[in-house]
Structure formats: structure tokens, C-alpha cells
Amino acid sequence: MRAFTRIAVVLLLVPGLVRAQSRPAADTLAASLQSRYQGIKDFTADFVHTYRGGVLRTQTQERGTVMVKRPGRMRWVYSAPERKEFVADGRKIYAYIPEDRQVIVSVVPADDQATTPALFLAGKGDISRDFTAAYADSPDPGTVSLKLTPRKEEPEYEYLIVTIDPVTLQIRALTTRDRQGGDSTLTFSNLQENRGLADKVFAFLIPRGVEVITDGTSK
């Protein structure tokens, strides 16, 4: 699977205040963010996914919608320029690109092994336990950003930068710095919480005639 596609399932968020002299410690904000999202049952949002840099110094932009339900359920649907889906039903994760006629199946990791931001949103992992937090420059006025560095080295990325609304603590953007020096940014809009999403929304039916890859083995 392409590196940009693999980054897609990597996503999360964090808090802050506008003025440096009045803001709490970064680790305190990280704990507040963890607490806030533990109280959210589900949410939906639109997103724009931009990738810049890396070995080939490329720039790519895609867009779509996301639905998340705790614990462990997600559906990322990319609509443009290419359709693809990433679905977690609580037990397994499915990555499907219709053009490739291929579905890649993996297991949702246990809470203490879930270090990607998307899985935190779905009720997996713990920000304070798994990351060290520090303030970072924020891309937009009226927002605050934190840099989250994993306590254990991750093969896919070096660190995350999460940008939030300092009043509501809602996510506005998430940037992932990958091991090739590229930045993958998810920018969120129209975020709505506690919609009462049904579990069936996160069911994935493998299409007929596609190649299914599980644990690196094709079927």
C-alpha cells in the first residue's frame, strides 16, 4: 500500500490556551484532552488530507468524511480524487482501495499498543502514558498546537502535532511527521459529537472478486 495511504489511519488531537504566560503545562493539556474524549461516545467530521515532502518532495491532497465510535470503531471514506475506505469494526481494520481491487485486513491493537491518533479517538490508548507533550507553533490564530512525541519509537512516524480550539478542545488539525521527513496533515471541519451512531455503520463487507491480504498473506 502506498505510504500516503498507510498514513491515513494515523490520526488524533490535543488542547491549549492562546497566551503563553497563562497556559497550563503541556502535559496537563494532554491529560485534559484525554479526559475530554473519554466522555465522547461518537463523532463525525469532514476532512482534508494533505501530504507534503518526504523523499520524493511530493504534495498530495485528498478529502472525505470520517465517523468514529468508542470503543475501537472508525470509518474513513475518501471521496476525492480517489475513493478509498479505512474501516475498524472494533476487532479488525480494513483498508480498501477499489481501483486496486484489494482489501488489507489487520487486527485492532490492544489499548496498551494503540499509539496512532485515530485509535485514541476511537477509545484506544492513552495520550499521557504513550506520549510526551510540548507546545508547538500553531498554524492559525485562535488555535493551539501540541507536539506529541511517542515514548517508544514508532516505525511509521517521528511525532504528531495536534491543533485544537482552545475553548472547546475540539480538533482542528493533526500533522504526522513520517520517517522520510514528510508531513501528513488532516484538517477537520463540521465536527459533530454524540450523534448516536449505530454499530452497523462500522461493518465492512468485503466486495466479491477482490484480493484479501491478511498478515501479509494474499487470499
Segments predicted by a language model, with ranges:
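Bacterial N-terminal signal peptides that target proteins for export
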Residues: 1-8
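Hydrophobic h-region of N-terminal signal peptides that target proteins for export
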Residues: 10-20
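N-terminal leader/targeting segments and the immediate start of mature chains
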Residues: 19-59, 206-219
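Short, solvent-exposed helix-to-loop capping segments enriched in aromatics
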Residues: 37, 114-128
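Amphipathic hydrophobic-ligand
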Residues: 58-64, 182
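An acidic-aromatic
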Residues: 65-115, 184-185
